[in-house]
A protein has these predicted regions:
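Hydrophobic ligand-binding cavity/cleft-lining segments
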Residues: 1-36
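Short coil-to-beta transition motif at edge beta-strands of beta-rich domains
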Residues: 41-47
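Short beta-strand-to-loop capping motifs
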Residues: 7-9, 51, 112-114
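Hydrophobic pocket/interface hotspot
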Residues: 14-18, 24, 47, 61, ...
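Hydrophobic-ligand binding "helix-grip"
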Residues: 52-103, 113
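Intrinsic-disorder/low-complexity, polar/charged segments enriched in Ser/Thr/Lys/Arg/Asp/Glu/Gln
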Residues: 1-6, 46, 56, 69, ...
């Protein structure tokens, strides 16, 4: 799946909106309530995206170019107790965020692998999350 949104803000402002804890929680909440990031976004690091109920995904920061590109490769589903299930629906999937800027407008493109049974949910909710990123970055 892939979605894009044009934002009247610099790449740096959009990047900060995506990945600073306070604003990440605001836009990611639309996808899965209470979602937050645990760990440091640094190439080669593993981080976790956990929802309010403690479930989520452990992912590898495979490629990171600040203010331009971030690629995650999902390693394992994470259960409420922190246990990781290696063979689960998100394992092996990719998720990327690309920012391109021109004439004061940044285009944010999010692309990701989604289990077939969740495609409808993400198609309905991810554009709303990106619109929230836009609102936050433009304020």
């Amino acid at each position: 799946m892939q979605f894009s949104v044009e934002i009247q803000a610099s790449k740096e402002e959009v990047w900060d909106t995506l990945w600073q804890d306070e604003t990440l929680r605001e836009w990611a909440d639309i996808i899965d309530p209470g979602t937050h990031l645990v760990g440091e976004l640094k190439e080669g690091n593993k981080v976790q995206f956990l929802s309010g109920n403690g479930y989520g995904v452990t992912t590898l920061v495979e490629k990171l170019t600040p203010n331009e590109f971030l690629l995650f490769r999902h390693q394992a589903d994470t259960q409420g107790n922190g246990e990781q299930k290696r063979k689960a629906e998100w394992t092996g999937g990719k998720e990327s965020y690309t920012l391109t800027e021109g004439d004061g407008v940044t285009t944010l493109t999010a692309a990701f692998d989604v289990p077939p049974e969740q495609e409808e949910y993400f198609a309905a909710n991810y554009p709303k999350a990106l619109e929230r990123v836009k609102e936050l970055a433009e304020r």
